[in-house]
């Protein structure tokens, strides 16, 4: 997992509410378990429309997706955050995320940022006025700044540490390897062991 400390980027607008994981990553592309190679399938059906924001030249290379209310609803599929990250997004800003989508995103180092409707609408207005507008996100300070729009976001300390240091679940487990080995050595032989 890559480390995320600061993100400075243009933003890609997705001004739609209740975008579910099947729209983000359609079910026909869920046959693999690798984490990479999903970017091309992101919003697959919507990309057939040449006016869809992912198709527009001015938004190519954006690392921040600004989405409408209630992003990532529906079934739990890790492939949806994988596709977003594979496309190049490091962060998503919305008013609300489905809990499991939020957790799946944090687990791979994709930063979900919840904020007020006023802030999201303000960002949409900035993007519409000038697609080259940059946003600056500090994971360390838990802050977002885009010109005069400034706000803080909630992120628990453990998730913040994981994103700042690029730690996935395996990395975290390996940090406790000596404790695991000590536990195994102290257990009676007839009891099950962690190996």
Language model feature labels by segment:
Residues 1-68, 72-195:
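Cytosolic catalytic domains that perform sulfur/thiol-centered chemistry
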């Amino acid at each position: 997992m890559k480390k995320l400390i600061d993100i400075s980027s243009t933003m890609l607008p997705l001004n739609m509410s209740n975008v579910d994981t099947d729209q983000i990553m359609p079910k026909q592309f869920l046959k693999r378990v690798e984490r990479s190679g999903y970017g091309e399938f992101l919003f697959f059906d919507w990309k057939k429309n040449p006016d869809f924001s992912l198709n527009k030249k001015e938004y190519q290379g954006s690392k921040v997706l600004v989405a409408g209310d209630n992003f990532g609803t529906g079934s739990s599929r890790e492939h949806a955050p994988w596709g977003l990250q594979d496309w190049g997004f490091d962060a998503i800003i919305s008013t609300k995320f489905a809990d499991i989508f939020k957790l799946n995103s944090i687990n791979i180092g994709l930063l979900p940022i919840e904020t007020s409707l006023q802030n999201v609408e303000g960002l949409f207005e900035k993007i519409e006025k000038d697609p080259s507008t940059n946003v600056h996100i500090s994971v360390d300070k838990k802050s977002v700044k885009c010109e005069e729009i400034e706000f803080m976001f909630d992120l628990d300390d453990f998730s913040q540490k994981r994103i700042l240091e690029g730690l996935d679940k395996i990395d975290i487990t390996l940090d406790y390897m000596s404790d695991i080995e000590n536990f195994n050595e102290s257990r009676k032989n007839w009891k099950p062991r962690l190996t």
